[in-house]
Amino acid sequence: MDATSILDYVLNNTTLRRLVLSDGDDASQPPPLSVKEVGDGNINFVFVVSGNGGCIVLKQALPFVRCVGESWPLTQQRATFEVNALVEQRRLCPELVPIVYHFDASKALIGMQFIAPPNMILRRALMAGHRYPHFAQHLGTFLAKTLFGTSLLALDGVTLRAKVAEWSANSAMCALTEKVIFDDPYIECRHNRWTSPQLDAFSGLIRSSTELKVAAALLKGKFLSCTQALLHGDLHTGSVMASEKTTYVIDPEFAFYGPMGFDVGALLSNLLLSYFSQAATNGADYAEWVLEQTVILHQTFAAGFLELWSESLRQAEASVAGAGDGEHFKAAVFDTARSVERAQAAFMQNLWYDSLGFAGVKMIRRIVGLAHVADLEDIHDADKRSDCEKRALLLGTELVLLSQSQQGLSCVLQLADRARQVYAGSTPQSLV
């Protein structure tokens, strides 16, 4: 759809029309509406329609990958999954998810809440050097509530299996993820690109390292087979809008049941990419602030997740009406404080190393694969950009390998310390 057809659509839809027109609009005159295409993503069109009564967003899923073209087809059914994910995530975390007003499956068109300025895409805010004081805590809370609430820690086995079956139908979007994150960066692929010639040797090492490819393949296996919770599926800083006071998570069209660490790692990776980019943009002081937010985000997530888990166990023990006793680590089995503590520690350790691994493969793919991040791409000096990218690749490959050995960087504070070492060190000449 284009701007003209979008306006016609809104005017002919009672729900949407009511949201943008005011009672004082003169029915004898052309409706005072404006439309602007604002999407800067890789696969959709996004329009803002404004009138005297308010603003709404209309998002249309294209039948191909926008950043590649019609040669790469993509299912429009993803819009259905996006709507369902927004509804579920808003149920669990209403303060951080926009409202869906309308969905037209035949056109793959979603009408939703307009998130007004000063909110802006978080990636752009970080590139501009803004210091939003609450976004890290908000995103940690979003992860805790949505991952716990859709997992076997909160649901019974029958319910979870039904949900896994339902969300497994979003297989086309999962297949895209599998290709661009777990496969393409490790082979010769026409869609891959990198800063050349500065990163030629680095990209070659990634494609030739058997150890790295094995670790990435094991992470891919977990992505394919581990159905822990309903994931956003593409939770980067471009899928978040934020301001001084508010944060919203948007664009969950890749949603599926998968390993929790994939969503956690997605945010860690994007904040780390932002961190390394600051050497060529906003400087060391702001870089340190970004790294501090990375720590806050994960600490908030871990604390919130464990509190939800502990509260669920307390309610199950007290037989609170309506309280769920999750199938995994049932209260009747883990009936002492020590057993709960051990169970939680083991679970969170595995989740942490999963998160590191998924963060690593995402960092790698954003530098030598398809669909790079503006944090780095907008550094116009190729030598400065490649210096930042080399540091990010060094840490990214370390994280992928650590996810399998589970030796070192056992908490987010240690991750931050290692990131500081890489940031402050000389420009890496190799990944080994």
Feature map (PLM): residue ranges:
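Conserved NTP-binding catalytic cores of kinases and kinase-like/nucleotidyltransferase enzymes
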Residues: 1-108, 116, 244, 411-432
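Regulatory N- and C-terminal appendages and interdomain linkers associated
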Residues: 1-37, 53, 154-157, 327-432
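Active-site acidic catalytic loop and adjacent metal/ATP-binding pocket
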Residues: 36-51, 56-58, 216-262
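Conserved ATP-binding subdomain of kinase catalytic cores across diverse folds
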Residues: 45, 50-175, 310-317
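A glycine-centered beta->alpha junction motif in the catalytic cores
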Residues: 61-68, 112-130, 148-149, 270-281, ...
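Short helix/strand-bridging catalytic loops that position acidic/His residues to coordinate divalent metals
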Residues: 67-73, 122-131, 249-257, 263, ...
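Active-site activation/catalytic loop segments of kinase-like enzymes and analogous catalytic loops
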Residues: 84, 261-337, 359-375
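ATP-dependent phospho-/nucleotidyl transfer catalytic cores
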Residues: 120-232, 243
